[in-house]
């Protein structure tokens, strides 16, 4: 982890979002700020559905650089701001390389990702942030 934080500092990044796992499955997002060291700034429990789980077969090329993340907020409460902060996104952003769609669901907030350069439909994965209203 120390090497990851050093690399982030060297490249001028202000945050590192870590997907923590349990028994090989995503279990939480952990946010580190490189200048604060190995102290977790925020942790959010999650569940995830992969592209395969969602039945998506369209090939999606990864973005190889930091892109702008726009947020489409359908939740409208403090949970939206917390999730946007994890990803370094502003709730006011309306255009970006990736659009993060936040919707309320039974367990908390469903996070879907849309890549306007590929499709107007979600491209996966689908993440549920387990957060109470």
Where does each model-flagged region fall?
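Phospho-regulatory, Ser/Thr- and acidic-rich intrinsically disordered linkers and terminal tails
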Residues: 1-133
């Amino acid at each position: 982890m120390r090497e990851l934080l050093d690399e982030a500092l060297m490249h001028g990044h202000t945050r590192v979002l870590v997907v923590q796992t349990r028994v090989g499955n995503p279990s939480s997002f952990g946010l580190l700020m490189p200048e604060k060291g190995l102290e977790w700034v925020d942790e959010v429990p999650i569940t995830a559905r992969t592209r395969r789980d969602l039945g998506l077969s369209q090939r999606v090329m990864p973005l190889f650089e930091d892109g702008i993340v726009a947020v489409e907020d359908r939740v409208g409460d403090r949970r939206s701001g917390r999730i946007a902060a994890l990803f370094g996104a502003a709730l006011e952003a309306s255009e970006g390389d990736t659009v993060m769609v936040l919707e309320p669901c039974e367990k908390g907030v469903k996070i879907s990702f849309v890549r306007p350069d590929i499709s107007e439909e979600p491209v996966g994965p689908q993440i549920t942030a387990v957060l109470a209203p």
